[in-house]
């Protein structure tokens, strides 16, 4: 029995799925995914990220809200790849619970974004999201998106 090849999504296709653009497109590549179940993506953190100008001068740390936004975008990609939308529908970030930050994300880091579907009901899909750097958890949260 052979292992299945990873299902990679490059930035060009990501931009067809998400409306975000620079400086708020926070997923560089999807490394693999399984519709309706999980997705693994990466965000490379450059010292040139616009947020580092003020967060914090001389001590650049990726703001936690941007880590959560990166997880939400990974969630959106999985939702778009899983569920069929009717004309004019989009997926919207609907909620976040139990967000915890465990380590800083710094320039030069490669942040791995892992999202997993918990359940889908009446147009609301719940996910777990975990962002890691070098295998260490940087952030974990429960996320929700709504189809509207």
From Swiss-Prot:
This is 3-hydroxyacyl-[acyl-carrier-protein] dehydratase FabZ. InterPro entries: FabA_FabZ, FabZ, HotDog_dom_sf. The gene is fabZ. The keyword Cytoplasm applies. The active site is at residue 55. It comes from the Bacteria. GO terms for cellular component: cytoplasm; membrane. Its main location: cytoplasm. One of its GO terms (biological process) is lipid A biosynthetic process. Its EC number is 4.2.1.59. The lineage of its organism: Bacteria, Pseudomonadati, Pseudomonadota, Gammaproteobacteria, Pasteurellales. Belongs to the thioester dehydratase family. FabZ subfamily. It comes from Haemophilus influenzae (strain 86-028NP). Involved in unsaturated fatty acids biosynthesis. Catalyzes the dehydration of short chain beta-hydroxyacyl-ACPs and long chain saturated and unsaturated beta-hydroxyacyl-ACPs. One of its GO terms (molecular function) is (3R)-hydroxyacyl-[acyl-carrier-protein] dehydratase activity.
């Amino acid at each position: 029995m052979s292992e299945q090849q990873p299902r990679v999504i490059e930035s060009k296709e990501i931009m067809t799925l998400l409306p975000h653009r620079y400086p708020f497109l926070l997923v560089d590549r999807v490394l693999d995914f399984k519709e309706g179940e999980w997705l693994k993506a990466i965000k490379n953190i450059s010292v040139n990220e616009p947020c580092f100008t003020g967060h914090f001068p001389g001590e650049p740390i990726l703001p936690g809200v941007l880590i959560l936004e990166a997880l939400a975008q990974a969630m959106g990609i999985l939702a778009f790849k899983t569920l069929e939308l009717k004309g004019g529908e989009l997926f919207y970030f609907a909620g976040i619970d139990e967000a915890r930050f465990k380590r800083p994300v710094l320039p030069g880091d490669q942040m791995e974004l892992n999202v997993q579907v918990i359940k889908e009901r009446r147009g609301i899909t719940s996910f777990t999201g975990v962002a890691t750097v070098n295998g260490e958890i940087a952030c974990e949260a429960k996320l929700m998106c709504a189809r509207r």
